[in-house]
Amino acid sequence: MTETSTLGPVRSTSRRDPNRAHPTSTYTSLLASIREEGLLQRSRVFYMSLLATLVLALGGCIAGFILLGDSWFQLLIAAALGIVFTQFAFLGHEASHRQVFESGKANDRLGRILASGVAGLSYSWWMTKHTRHHGNPNQIGRDPDIDPDTVSFYDADAAATRGWRAAIVRRQGYLFFPLLTFEGVNLHVHSIGHIFGRGKVDRRWLEITLVVARLAVVVAAVFLVLPLGMAFAFLGVQLAVFGFYMGAAFAPNHIGMPVIPAGTKLDFLRKQVLTSRNIIGGTWATVVFGGLNHQVEHHLFPSMARPHLARARAMVREHCRIEGIDYTEQTVGRSYINVIQYMNRVGLHARDPFNCPALGNLRRV
């Protein structure tokens, strides 16, 4: 059934019978059914094939970069690199969730190589941040993904903004996607700050070596081969595409879904399902979003390999229907519209930095 709300049409379900089993036990039964279907088994052949494909794609970009030389067509190579680096980051994300190998060490090894050595991001920073997010998605004070930043993800934070940030937050819905072009730089800056910071960093020197080497090699190659202006344009396009793709892939997952107040306790099943949004689109969506289109299933079963998510979706939807838990899935276009609408609505709570309090009082007289 389709229901219309301020967040747009979502798929909802009938209400749960109060006589049914507690959600904790129903999640346990769902997990048992998923395991019985073999959906928690690793898919090494799939991931090795995907890795080989991405390595070939990266090799093609490098070959094109060398062959084109001093040409503005290099910007197409830059855009392609942004896409390929994002796909490597998706694969690193899956390795961090133990989706590739049975061994945790093997997954960490692959994830660190892909995230730090190929994408140029700190694997330990990502693991720390992402683990907290999965434990408490969209919960104020516990999910770092909705902590105060350039934009605001909930009303109270927007209302507390001041100065230039308030000016951005007031228009953040319309500015959201343009701002994503800077997300690549933001991710690299956070990664460098983490590995060189005072906090605990797992395998610090290895990550420093991988991240610094990756960034240095790309920058050096670009400035050695291309003229100065073209080199800056190349890096600008690569970083913009990388940031936009990463941000646009993760944005529909939770933005516009219910935000859980600080201190509120929910059972695992509801906490994960009610705050997550799936993207309808079949195989193409799974490829483009790196499996993130099955966000509900990913949060319920973080170690589930990408090829099994679609089959799990049918089981989870039916389970939520029986239990009366809202299960949200939308087209990619509708999800982005909802993201913009939600961000604009939150932004209305931001203070106008040019507003005169005295004039405001006169207006109310």
Region locations from a protein language model:
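Short, charged cytosolic
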Residues: 5, 9-33, 175-187
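Short intracellular "coupling" helices and adjacent cytoplasmic loop segments at the cytosolic face
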Residues: 12-22, 42-44, 118-123, 142
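Low-complexity, highly charged intrinsically disordered N-terminal segments
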Residues: 16-53, 57-60
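Alpha-helical bilayer-embedded segments of polytopic membrane proteins, i.e.
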Residues: 42-88, 115-120, 173-185, 200-250
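Membrane-embedded catalytic scaffold of the fatty acid hydroxylase/desaturase
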Residues: 80-200, 263-354
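C-terminal, active-site-flanking charged/polar segments
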Residues: 238-251, 255-256, 317-321, 326
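C-terminal, non-catalytic macromolecule-binding modules
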Residues: 247-272
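C-terminal regulatory/interaction regions
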Residues: 354-365
